[in-house]
A protein has these predicted regions:
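Nucleic-acid endonuclease domains
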Residues: 1-83, 87-200
């Protein structure tokens, strides 16, 4: 008898069903919204802010997927199939900053690729998307930091070809200003991505 989780046939997950937050857990007095609030309640936190940046880009281009796929080889996809990697940075953090503002840095531009059909990572780091978006939360005053105000964001866009030609893995805002186009306000992001996609 083949044990659960082994064997050549493998396992295929059932389709994910989007939740609306009102659902209640069995065995604990809590809703899915309670869980979301606990996990993502502070949109200044690094991981959460990065996912917010991905969400903003997804909304801008009309990503047809109903749910974020955390293990995918790109962050966002457009309706025409252009794949996008979103990198996020900010001057302010959710913790005390005795040394002042954080430097604007974007890392892991190239990363090992996950092959879900073979259940393995690629040996070498690769540029995995057609377009890169560098999202910067620009607020510098902690008292004025409004996590819901999208005008506090600016976006820079470049093609994957530029990343490959420059052979960079981590870049600062100086590199972005020199080699990417922008900064764009949120309203100009979709057009900028479409333009960069022609160059990848």
């Amino acid at each position: 008898m083949t044990e659960h989780g082994s064997g050549p046939a493998g396992l295929t997950p059932s389709a994910a069903v989007p939740l609306d937050g009102s659902e209640r857990f069995a065995g604990v007095d809590a809703t899915v919204a309670d869980f979301w609030r606990w996990v993502c309640g502070d949109l200044r936190e690094n991981t959460t802010r990065g996912m917010l940046a991905e969400f903003l880009v997804a909304k801008a281009v009309g990503d047809p997927r109903a749910l974020r796929i955390g293990w995918d080889n790109f962050d966002v996809v457009t309706p025409d199939g252009t794949t996008i990697e979103v990198k996020c940075s900010a001057f302010l953090q959710s913790w005390p900053q005795p040394q002042g503002h954080s430097a604007i840095v974007f890392g892991r531009l190239a990363a090992r690729e996950w092959d879900a059909t073979r259940n393995e990572w690629s040996v070498d780091a690769r540029i995995r998307a057609d377009v890169f978006v560098f999202a910067v939360q620009t607020q510098r005053d902690p008292a004025a930091y409004d996590v819901l105000d999208i005008s506090h964001w600016e976006f820079w866009v470049t093609s994957a070809r530029t990343i490959r030609e420059q052979a960079v893995k981590t870049v600062g805002i100086g590199w972005v200003r020199q080699h990417a186009t922008g900064p764009f306000p949120y309203g100009g992001l979709a057009h900028a991505i479409h333009t960069a996609a022609q160059l990848h």
